[in-house]
Structures are given as C-alpha cells and as structure tokens.
C-alpha cells in the first residue's frame, strides 16, 4: 500500500514522504491515527506544492535572520540598568527578557526572549558581557551589553 506520511513515524519516514507499507499496517495503524493519507496523484501534487512552499519559507526565514544579525552588529550602546549594591553586586540577576528589552531600547530589532543564550553562570555583577542569539538554525548573532547601576 502506498501512503504519504503526514507526521514523522519512527523507522518509516518524515512528513511528506511517500512510503510503501503492508496493507494491514497502513489500514489498521497509520490511517486511523492520521499519520498518513492514501497516495493518489492529487495528494502527491498537493504534497509537492507544500514542500516547495516550505523551502521558500525557509529561505525567507534565513534571509530575515541574516538581516537581524546585521542590525545587531551595528548596535553600539546596549545598557541593562539594574538595581545594585554599593559594591556592584546585583539584587537578582539579568534575565533574557532584560537583554531583549535593552536591545529594543538601544534601537535594535524586537526579539523573542527564547532565542537568548545567556553566558555560563548568571550575570551577577556590573560590567560588560556578551550574549548569543539563536536567530535561525544556521544564524547566530552576538550582542555585547553592559550591566549598569540604575
């Protein structure tokens, strides 16, 4: 039986792949669970169209990530103001959200806090730090920021 997978199936394939399976496995497991559809000419053409659209979207996402990385490289003064003691220790620590807000305040792009990769150990003192931003699987941006007393 020829099927088109709609979801990843272990030891069988990824979504969009056309696979040949035994009739019982297809009828009793894959089709009822919505993991596959019967391969017809129309379904194959539809899957090809979806794959082309996904490839085009991936290229656009990669180009957009590169543009954001360029904008981040142009940023100069990214300051994260925090409450500190007289000795320079922070009350708390600097979070990913603090960094994203500081980048936006410095004129950079608006970012999602989930892409921020904080340096090893928490930022607990004032000073200069560097953080990586995972903009895309193939694009990593870096931002230098200063933690200053508020």
UniProtKB/Swiss-Prot annotation:
GO biological process terms on file: translation
GO MF, one annotated term: rRNA binding
Function: Binds to the 23S rRNA.
Organism in which the protein naturally occurs: Corynebacterium aurimucosum (strain ATCC 700975 / DSM 44827 / CIP 107346 / CN-1) (Corynebacterium nigricans)
Gene Ontology CC: ribonucleoprotein complex; ribosome
Pfam families for this protein: Ribosomal_L9_C (PF03948), Ribosomal_L9_N (PF01281)
Keywords for this protein: Ribonucleoprotein, Ribosomal protein, RNA-binding, rRNA-binding
HAMAP family: Ribosomal_bL9
Name this protein carries in UniProt: Large ribosomal subunit protein bL9
InterPro entries according to UniProt: Ribosomal_bL9, Ribosomal_bL9/RNase_H1_N, Ribosomal_bL9_bac/chp, Ribosomal_bL9_C, Ribosomal_bL9_C_sf, Ribosomal_bL9_N, Ribosomal_bL9_N_sf
Keyword Aminoacyl-tRNA synthetase carried by entry: no
Protein's UniProt keywords contain Ribosomal protein: yes
Entry-linked NCBIfam families: L9
Highest taxon of the lineage: Bacteria
Coiled-coil parts of chain: none
Protein family per UniProt: Belongs to the bacterial ribosomal protein bL9 family.
């Amino acid at each position: 039986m020829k099927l088109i997978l709609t979801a990843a199936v272990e030891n069988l394939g990824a979504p969009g792949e056309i696979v040949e399976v035994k009739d019982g496995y297809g009828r009793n497991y894959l089709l009822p669970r919505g993991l596959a559809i019967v391969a017809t000419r129309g379904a194959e053409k539809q899957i090809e169209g979806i794959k082309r659209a996904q490839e085009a979207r991936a290229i656009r996402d990669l180009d957009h990530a590169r543009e954001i990385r360029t904008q981040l490289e142009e940023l100069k003064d990214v300051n994260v103001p925090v409450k500190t003691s007289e000795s320079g220790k922070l009350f708390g620590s600097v979070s990913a959200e603090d960094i994203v807000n500081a980048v936006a305040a410095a004129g950079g792009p608006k970012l999602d806090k989930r892409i921020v990769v904080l340096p090893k150990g928490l930022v607990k003192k004032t000073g200069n730090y560097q953080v990586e931003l995972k903009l895309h699987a193939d694009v990593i941006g870096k931002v230098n920021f200063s933690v200053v007393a508020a």
